[in-house]
Amino acid sequence: EILTEELKVLQQRYQELMRKAKIAAGKTLLYKEPPYYITLGKELPAKALDEILTDSKEIYEELQEYYKKDTSFDKISVTFYEDTYSLYNLYRFAHYYEEAYGKYIWLKSGASLVIEHTEAMTVIDVNTGSVLKKKRQEDTLFYQINREAAKEIARQIRLRNISGIIMIDFINMKDEKQKEKLLLLLENECRKDRIHCNVVDMTALNLVEMTRSKVRRPLLEQITVCRKMQKN
């Protein structure tokens, strides 16, 4: 059913492009990919998006116009927000902005993740932090921390839309069975991702290499906080 609807949309788009091509002058732009905030509804999992709320009149009208032409967006409502209290403050965007951009991610155990982006890859380092000051039995503790980190790493990869090569530096473990269980856990967590992930292997130094397909630009490159929001 979903594929049928998608095919209808593509057929309509093709017919519209052919109609424009017959009457358009030379070097006329016939089609331009819609901005990210318009196509977001298709990229999210089913039922993940019920409403789009915006305080931009221009974006609101653009969304309304586009969604009228595409029946796949019928169940998504578009609302224009007119209150004097900004959406930025109402939904605590600063907090989520920091979570999506921050280099350091603190775990409940007291350990932390350090996420760094380079041109070649993304490197994620797992640090024990102050945990060792509280507990003993390092082997068991390191395994527990690595499990907690693996779950959060998979979540952060989805949240930040990190793609390409990803290197994860887990805390050193000696037990081979624990390493296998950790890899399996990471693979299972990555299966929650609608974008294809491939956990390659773990080296003797507890470095895990994985890849994630690139569907669109990472969140780091997408979000731009305007000066008006920053002042608020």
List where the protein language model places each region.
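OB-fold/S1-family RNA-binding modules
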Residues: 1-113, 118, 204-206, 211-214, ...
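Conserved glycine-centered short motifs in functionally critical loops
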Residues: 10, 109-232
